[in-house]
Curated annotation (Swiss-Prot):
This is Globin. The keyword Transport applies. Pfam families: Globin. Monomer. It comes from the Eukaryota. The keyword Nucleotidyltransferase does not apply. Oxygen binding protein.
């Protein structure tokens, strides 16, 4: 178990207004990808729906909106699995196989996103405890996925 039930409940309670609709999930995901692509514009070409995008226009692309929703949908699935180690490990394996292996992302490349996403979510979340819970979850996810790439 990565998160206790109380940690999960607290984190979900704070995140809920940001993940309660597809529009909110897209906005949250766009923010995360804005930070990732600012730090690593070379990653844009790893996404099949962003092949024509440039760093200047990537976030306006329909593909970016698609990936933003997908990112947060996957994160919510991983969060929901976070109180059971076996379920979380299965979900991590699924995201590695489904989303990252087909893009030829190396474990080292994937790991570069960890501090970016931790920083992003530390700004999204206002409660220090929830920031710590999210960091713990993201560290588990990034380490787990990178280990399978």
């Amino acid at each position: 178990m990565v998160l206790t039930k109380d940690e999960f409940d607290s984190l979900l309670h704070e995140l809920d207004p940001k993940i309660d609709t597809e529009e909110h999930r897209m906005e949250l995901g766009l923010g995360a990808y804005t930070e990732l692509f600012a730090a690593h514009p070379e990653y844009i070409k790893k996404f099949s729906r962003l092949q024509e995008a440039t760093p200047a226009n990537v976030m306006a692309q329909d593909g970016a909106k698609y990936y933003a929703k997908t990112l947060i949908n996957d994160l919510v699935e991983l969060l929901k699995a976070s109180t059971d180690e076996a379920t979380l490990n299965t979900a991590i394996a699924r995201t590695a196989t489904k989303d990252h292996k087909p893009r030829n992302v190396s474990g080292a490349e994937f790991q570069t996103g960890e501090p970016i996403f931790i920083k992003y979510f530390s700004h999204v979340l206002t409660t220090p405890a929830n920031q710590a819970f999210m960091e713990k979850l993201l560290t588990k996810i990034f380490t787990g996925v990178a280990g399978q790439l």
